[in-house]
Amino acid sequence: MKKLFVLFYALMCLVTLQAQKVTLQDVANGTYRAQSIQGLKPMLDGEHYAQISKDHKRIVKYSFKTGKEVATIFDVATARNHKLKSFDDYIMSPDESLILIQTETKPIYRRSFTAVYYIYNVRNRTLEPLSNNGPQQVPLFSPDSHQIA
């Protein structure tokens, strides 16, 4: 009886496998690629996530429950001390009090790049350059959010 069950199961698997025809065109077009959301970064409270606006001028806070915009975390128009036209990416500090704003990104090789970074204080809405000595590569916040390496 077990042998019949295994044989029946194997035949069913073969039939379902033959139903799908995999073509080179489907593979090249990304038909079988996993879908994901780009640029979505969960926040500490677990209720919200942050995402860059389409025009790359704001970091917007959204609700996971409703998917609606809740607040604007960063806006190039309201940032004080420095004016930016837009930005490329951002890195939030572990306590979400500071944000590294990435601008003027220049690729080096494959996934490596240099960029000019600014430190944005969420509470004061002030924007200060990370360095006056040119672009940096891979800056990171310390676990206590007080230093940047």
Segments predicted by a language model, with ranges:
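Beta-propeller folds
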Residues: A19-A149
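Bacterial Sec-dependent N-terminal signal peptides
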Residues: M1-V22
